[in-house]
């Protein structure tokens, strides 16, 4: 067990040598075989992110409030002061760390599923982009791995392009979690932040938006390819205002990572979810994956199903500071058609039957 802990500490530090040497020194016990240790490191890498996303912010808030009531109150006071002074940083592009984005832990995260990033066209560093990510899934695991880390080599595949994965603004009001998210280049998904990145941050920026949002997450389930997009047009308007090209992305396998109880429209369960989404900002989902010890037991570890994220052809968008509804409708329809073609082109290559269709709601 000490050997496993030592190995994982090397993963968190982003070093590979300590991990490899530790694994080679393992005794010849079946559950301590090299492949078993690597698999457990992959599970731990995924689980730490899931738990960070779900409870890190709340847990750190509670800890800091507790510390504030002890003799160590100065530590909490200094951090909260720092938060106040640094409050607007997430809304101005954040504070990314190449070191964090290249941690070895993300490569183990990638290999757990595994996650793959497919490039179909070159992107020009002289342009800005809005990436539309579909489907949302429960936690956008493919989006995080591909665009919030360097595990799949996004910066090498698209040289000169800096990706900004957008997520709920409320996450950046949580102590420690905000620092963790910003280190990966993650930013709040609100109009002010997107406007700043696309207008005051030079060129070569790509804002990655899970367009379907919380509403789409309520409908995701394995084997279903449905995206909430027909009435989502705000991202198209922003793209027109800044002349940012639109890039459709479909992540095959994103909906296969968790199973959830889907409440039908009009049911009491869906009513509660929608009210929660309206007033809190996100929708609570009743979902489960597998446990740490067995894929046959329920838990928070996502199912190890492949996620292949295909980045489509950019749609050239002109800059129109005051776009009309007709302008928005035109480029929205172009985006729908492009996403549909992308899905149809790759579905059979990635294991779906030719009869499978992409549904827009």
From Swiss-Prot:
Q: Which GO terms describe its biological process?
A: diacylglycerol biosynthetic process; diacylglycerol metabolic process; glycerol metabolic process; monoacylglycerol biosynthetic process; triglyceride biosynthetic process
- Which segments cross the bilayer? 43-61, 66-85
Q: What Enzyme Commission number(s) does the record list for this chain?
A: 2.3.1.20, 2.3.1.76
- Cytoplasmic topological domain ranges are 1-42, 86-361
Reactions this protein catalyses: an acyl-CoA + a 1,2-diacyl-sn-glycerol = a triacyl-sn-glycerol + CoA; all-trans-retinol + an acyl-CoA = an all-trans-retinyl ester + CoA; 2-(9Z-octadecenoyl)-glycerol + (9Z)-octadecenoyl-CoA = 1,2-di-(9Z-octadecenoyl)-sn-glycerol + CoA; 1,2-di-(9Z-octadecenoyl)-sn-glycerol + (9Z)-octadecenoyl-CoA = 1,2,3-tri-(9Z-octadecenoyl)-glycerol + CoA
S-S bridge residues: none
Top-level taxonomic group: Eukaryota
- GO function terms (MF aspect): diacylglycerol O-acyltransferase activity; retinol O-fatty-acyltransferase activity
Q: Where in the cell is it found?
A: Endoplasmic reticulum membrane; Lipid droplet; Cytoplasm, Perinuclear region
Q: Does the keyword Acyltransferase apply?
A: yes
Record's keyword annotation contains Isomerase? no
InterPro entries, per the entry = DAGAT
What cellular component GO annotations does this protein have?
endoplasmic reticulum membrane; lipid droplet; perinuclear endoplasmic reticulum membrane
Membrane topology reported for the UniProt record: Multi-pass membrane protein
Q: Which UniProt keywords apply?
A: Acyltransferase, Cytoplasm, Endoplasmic reticulum, Glycerol metabolism, Lipid biosynthesis, Lipid droplet, Lipid metabolism, Membrane, Transferase, Transmembrane, Transmembrane helix
| Residues in compartment: Lumenal | 62-65
Pathway connected to this protein: Glycerolipid metabolism; triacylglycerol biosynthesis
Major place of residence: endoplasmic reticulum
Protein family according to the UniProt entry: Belongs to the diacylglycerol acyltransferase family.
Function text: Essential acyltransferase that catalyzes the terminal and only committed step in triacylglycerol synthesis by using diacylglycerol and fatty acyl CoA as substrates. Required for synthesis and storage of intracellular triglycerides. Probably plays a central role in cytosolic lipid accumulation.
Name used for this protein in its record: Diacylglycerol O-acyltransferase 2
Per the UniProt entry, what species is this protein from, by scientific name?
Answer: Xenopus laevis (African clawed frog)
């Amino acid at each position: 067990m000490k050997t496993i802990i030592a190995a994982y500490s090397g993963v968190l530090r982003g070093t590979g040598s300590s991990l490899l040497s530790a694994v080679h020194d393992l005794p010849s016990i079946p559950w301590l075989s090299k492949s078993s240790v690597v698999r457990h490191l992959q599970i731990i890498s995924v689980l730490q992110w899931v738990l960070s996303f779900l409870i890190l912010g709340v847990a750190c808030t509670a800890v800091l409030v507790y510390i504030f009531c002890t003799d160590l109150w100065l530590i909490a006071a200094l951090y909260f002061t720092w938060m106040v002074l640094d409050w607007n940083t997430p809304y101005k592009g954040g504070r990314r760390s190449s070191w964090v984005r290249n941690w070895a832990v993300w490569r183990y995260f990638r290999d757990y599923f595994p996650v793959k990033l497919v490039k179909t066209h070159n992107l020009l560093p002289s342009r800005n982009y809005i990436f539309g990510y579909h489907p949302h899934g429960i936690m956008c695991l493919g989006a995080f791995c591909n665009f919030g880390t360097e595990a799949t080599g996004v910066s090498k595949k698209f040289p000169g392009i800096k990706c900004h994965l957008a997520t709920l603004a409320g996450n950046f009001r949580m102590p420690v979690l905000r620092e963790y998210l910003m280190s990966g280049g993650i930013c709040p998904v609100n109009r002010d932040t997107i406007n700043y990145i696309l207008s005051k941050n030079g060129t070569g920026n790509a804002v990655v938006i899970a367009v379907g949002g919380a509403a789409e997450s309520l409908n995701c389930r394995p084997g279903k390819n449905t995206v909430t997009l027909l009435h989502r047009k705000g991202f198209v308007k922003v793209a027109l205002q800044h002349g940012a090209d639109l890039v459709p992305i479909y992540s095959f396998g994103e909906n296969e990572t968790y199973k959830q109880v889907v409440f039908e429209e009009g049911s009491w369960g869906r009513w509660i979810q929608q009210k929660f989404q309206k007033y809190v900002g996100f929708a609570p989902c009743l979902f489960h994956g597998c446990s740490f010890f067995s894929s046959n037991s329920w838990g928070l570890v996502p199912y190890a199903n492949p996620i292949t994220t295909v980045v489509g052809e950019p749609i050239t968008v002109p800059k129109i500071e005051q776009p009309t509804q007709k302008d928005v409708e035109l480029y929205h329809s172009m985006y729908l058609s492009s996403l549909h073609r992308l899905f149809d082109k790759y579905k059979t290559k990635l294991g779906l039957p030719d009869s499978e269709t992409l549904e827009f709601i």
